[in-house]
Amino acid sequence: SPPMRRRARIDGNHVAIVQTLRDLGVSVFSTAGVGDGFPDLVCGYHGTHLLELKDGSLSPSRRRLTDDEREWHEAWLGEPVEVVESPAQAAELVEYWDRLEVSKTET
């Protein structure tokens, strides 16, 4: 029989982070249901970004990447997966993407 797929867990702040990103003009596709270590969000904003969501209100041990997530992130050859723990951190990430884009156009 095929190996059991590990069920994906949706973090409590998922909806709020997605809404924050969309409010800031980011295209967001939730991949939280994919499981097996795949990141929670695929975002389009000055390129494509993969986000892993963790609930910042949980203890650090409960926010750690799972073995599946860590293996997936390490094997991924594209832009590094960003770990986001709150809507505020998501907004900071969008500001960072804006600054990166500006610095690219200035060179």
Predicted regions and their residues:
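Catalytic phosphate/metal-binding cores of nucleic-acid and nucleotide-processing enzymes, i.e., regions
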Residues: S1-T107
